[in-house]
Structure formats: C-alpha cells, structure tokens
Amino acid sequence: MSLHRVLSIYTRAGVTATASPFFSGRVADRASNMAAHNFVPFITNKREKSSGVGLSALAAKKPRVPRQSDSKKPSLVIFDKDGTLICFHSMWVPWTKQTTLKLNEAANLDISHKFYKLLGFCPVEQKVKTGLLAEGTMEQIRQRVVELLVESEVPRASAEQIVHSSVLDCNTSSPETLKQIHDLQGLFKELKTHNVKVAICTADSRKGTMNALQSLGLEKYVDLVVCGDDDGSLPKPHPHNALSICRVLGVDPEDALMVGDTLADMGMGRSANLGTVGVLSGVGDRHELHPHADHLVKHVGELMPLLLGSTQNNQNNMPSTN
C-alpha cells in the first residue's frame, strides 16, 4: 500500500479513507473534514528514501531542547514496533542467522562476519546492537547487502539475484519469535480510554507489520500504520513520516509523542517537534538515548503514569537496565 496514496486520498474526488487498510473507522469518519481543509501530502525524494547511511549520526546531530508542552497529556502517541512493542532480539536474531546461512550458500562464500557487522549483530551476545538492522528498512538492508557481495567480487547481477532469493521478510506472526514486551492490548485500550490516538511507524514491511498486529489482536486499536516499504515513506530519523501521521490524524506535532528504542526514533520525533520517550527494552541503551529523549522508561508498561503525570519518571534519576 502506498503511503503517498493514503496521504493524498483526501484530495481525490470520490475516494474515501475506508478504501485503505491504514485506517480504522474513527479515521475514516474524518476524511471529509480533511478534504475540506485542502490536505496536501508531503513531496518525497526517492534518492533520500534509498539512503541508509549514518542514521544514528543524523539522529544525534540536534541537541534535545525542552518543549513547552512536555507536561501536557498528548493527543497522539506514535510507537516504533520492534524493540518498543515487540521483542527485537527474539524476532530478528533467528532471522539474521537464517539469512546468513542462505547468503553463504547462495554466494558460495562465507560472509558471516561481514554480514553481522553490516547489520549490527553481535554473535557472542546473540543480540542486535544499534545499526542497520535496528534502524534501516528492508530495502536499505538489501541494497547494502548487494554492495557487500559486489565488494566480495560477486558480479552485481548475481549479487542482486542472491539478495532477492536470500534476504526475505521476517516471519512476524510465529508465536516462537513474536513476543510482546508488555500487555499491549491493555495499554492501547487505556490510551483510547483517555482519548489518545495510537499510530505505529516502523521500518519493517507492511506485510510483516500487519501480520504481527493481527496475531496480537491490536489492529482495531491502531488509528494509523506507516511502514518502511510504503511508497512515499522516508526512513527514520527523517521527520516526514511523523509529520504525515500528525496531518492525517489532525494532531499538532506539539501534541504528539514518539516512543521508540533507537536514536533514529528519537531523531525523527525531535526533528518533527514531537515529544520523545526512549524505551530501554530494545536496541538502544541509556547512554545512547539519554541525551536525545525527553524521558526514559524501562518499557512501554511504564508509559501511562508518565503520560498522566501520576509519577515523575525523570530520565536523570532513573537507573539503567542495560
């Protein structure tokens, strides 16, 4: 599904939001109002979309500045998926190992070490660190693996075929690998009780994302989903997707919150002028996220007290869990 198509849906006569799986009924009801306000989608840059270099560095460029609305309950929370809602390691470590075996066999080379380094996977700790796998889209990963094979003297045409057959989407619906970090249905229900909209912005594919949400019974609670392979999507930390979500849902970025586990998540939120909450349940650790998040929490289960102001989860006095 095209993000550009979804975002431009309000400017095309005779088309309603119910035609898109992005939307729940609540959002569909707003379609006519959005059209009346001449909603125009953002213009995207394909070259910028394909660039996957230095995501963490980009995210870390801009120092965190306190916002006037930090103490106000948000109208919208945008969640990253893997590492924030779903255990990153239980899903992507098996994928990394299986993909490595496929690449080695197809290329008749042992590129395990290079592939692990490219992705940010530590075979000793059996964990994914900050890097391409944690922050990039599948398109970016495939492009970089092609270049890795070419650098290993594999002809480009062969490298592209190897990647096409070996670097496949992750099976995100398997109960063996799909492990939610918290009671997500309970969390999303509580957000809805307090009239807070819910969106998900992930680098993962749409197929994998929707499979995961359906397996966990979450799709009915989510107002908008933006994925890495949606046409018109730009990778984090670019602010495009966050600003697009805010526009579609009719929320001022100042009244929205980005929740994620990587510098790319924090960078997207900050560059779009959203509040930012870093979670220590995924790839990023306290030392990475601390300078760039308005708040740090151990996991999304600690989010509601923070949003409602019943406890003060100050990032400067919270102990690290890493």
Explain the meaning of each model-derived region:
Residues 2-9, 23-76, 185, 189-190, ...:
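Asp-based, Mg2+/Mn2+-dependent phosphohydrolase catalytic module
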